[in-house]
């Protein structure tokens, strides 16, 4: 948990003071005790968006199994900063079961409204939207990003070994995305992706395809990200 606090300092000193505090206190509490509310200094105003990202095994089956959850924290003002923080799985297997039990999709594989509300509540974050990608979709995106090898599992992680594997594969992929965005090569990556084929068979969202493409265009028009980090709390 101490390592997690140190890693969160990256976010705290980059303007995400309130978010970092909430993630540390709500998602990975040091102990089960009542918290003392502390007044925090108001950070400099900034433009920020938060998206929650889900990885499942297969969107073509009746009940896709949850593999991983990440939160994407993006600030475009006063500076362009991007963070991917792992929320699930953790090394606390009991907590993993609790988080997994909240995940639920509708018949057309959209995240249920109750699940979305509960994830907002337990992580204490206001999400601007969500994305769900299955293993096939992730492998396709990894190929477009020139990730040579990505080891995936087909069921929810139930052991520390599978947790480590999921975290490693997620970090490999998202670190490559960070490299592309930080170097200004994001447009080249996104232009290679056949989104009309990927969505909705292997990639779904509460955003329409037009909305999603608009987000991509917005990112590509903005300056290169000064900071892009992948964080796995421990």
Predicted regions and their residues:
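Non-catalytic, solvent-exposed segments at the cell envelope interface
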Residues: 2-6, 10-234
């Amino acid at each position: 948990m101490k390592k997690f606090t140190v890693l969160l300092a990256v976010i705290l000193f980059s303007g995400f003071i309130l978010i970092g505090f909430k993630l540390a206190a709500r998602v990975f509490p040091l102990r089960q005790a009542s918290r003392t509310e502390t007044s925090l200094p108001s950070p400099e105003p900034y433009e920020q968006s938060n998206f929650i990202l889900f990885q499942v095994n297969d969107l073509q089956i009746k009940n896709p199994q949850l593999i991983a959850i990440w939160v994407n924290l993006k600030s475009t003002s006063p500076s362009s900063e991007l963070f991917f923080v792992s929320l699930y799985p953790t090394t606390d297997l009991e907590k993993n079961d609790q988080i997994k039990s909240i995940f639920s999709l509708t018949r057309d594989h959209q995240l249920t409204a109750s699940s979305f509300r509960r994830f907002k509540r337990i992580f204490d974050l206001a999400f601007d939207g969500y994305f769900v990608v299955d293993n096939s979709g992730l492998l396709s995106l990894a190929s477009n990003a020139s990730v040579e090898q990505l080891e995936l599992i087909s069921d929810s992680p139930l052991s520390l070994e599978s947790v480590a594997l999921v975290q490693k594969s997620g970090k490999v992929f998202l670190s490559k995305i960070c490299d592309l965005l930080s170097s200004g090569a994001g447009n080249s990556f996104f232009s290679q992706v056949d989104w009309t084929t990927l969505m909705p068979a292997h990639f779904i969202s509460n955003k329409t395809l037009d909305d999603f493409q608009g987000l991509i265009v917005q990112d590509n028009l903005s300056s290169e990200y000064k900071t892009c980090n992948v964080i796995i709390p421990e």
